Amino acid sequence: MLNNDFITRTFNSPGYLRCTLPEDVKEEVQRSIKKINEGEIDTIDVRENLAGHLQKEASFPITEKLNHLLTSLCHEYDEIFDNRIIKRCFHKDFINEYSEKGYVFNYKLRELWINYGKKHDFNPPHVHHGMYSFVLWIKIPYTSEEEEEFYPATEGNCKSGKFEFFFLSSNGSIISEVVSTNEWDLVLFPSSLYHSVYPFYSNDEERISISGNIFFEMIAESNLSTPNPWKSKKK
């Protein structure tokens, strides 16, 4: 045993939240997709602002129920992970000072888009803007078993068609976690967390997902229609 006094410090990497989209939110999203397909909603090509190597990525309308679900999940993340992301981005005195001046810090979904990926399209490792980001899988036209048939030598470790996070381990090495891409499942994660989407090969149909960024904004409390969720969180 050493006689020296020393302290220990462990490194923590952020995690993610996952849920299946509630039926009422799913119906709202389906209505928006239908209106886009029928030309009732105009979209903008947003590929030049994104990292994806995809044939089509377009703006998607921000709707009430989806916005409420996502901002609520951000607050859930803060509760579960002890406000870790906020503490990294904002000094507590800054939040406390402006809260006392009548300002509210709240989450707002500001950027939303839909991804249409064809065979061989992919997203290289990248990060997003904002505090939190999410991906919602709408259509996955293949199964893991179908993709593994193209690469049998991978012996169950085939990554084609998969979604993957990258983060630091406790000893500083880069590790990753593959996340299953189930239709109508949503994953929320810190925007600074690197992630990637691998190409698929077994199907000629489109892989469709929706992604977006949620920001942490300061607004005057007099302009807020809902209670200030941060008045009791002066940590």
Language-model features, listed with the residues they occupy:
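Non-heme Fe(II)/2-oxoglutarate
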Residues: 1-102, 112-115, 119-123, 159
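Catalytic core of Fe(II)/2-oxoglutarate
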Residues: 169-235
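Catalytic core of non-heme Fe(II) oxygenases with the double-stranded beta-helix
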Residues: 110-188, 198, 205-206
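Solvent-exposed residues in well-ordered beta-strands and their adjoining turns
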Residues: 22, 117, 137-139, 213-217
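Short hydrophobic/aromatic beta-strand or adjacent loop that forms the aromatic wall/cage
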Residues: 12-16, 133, 207
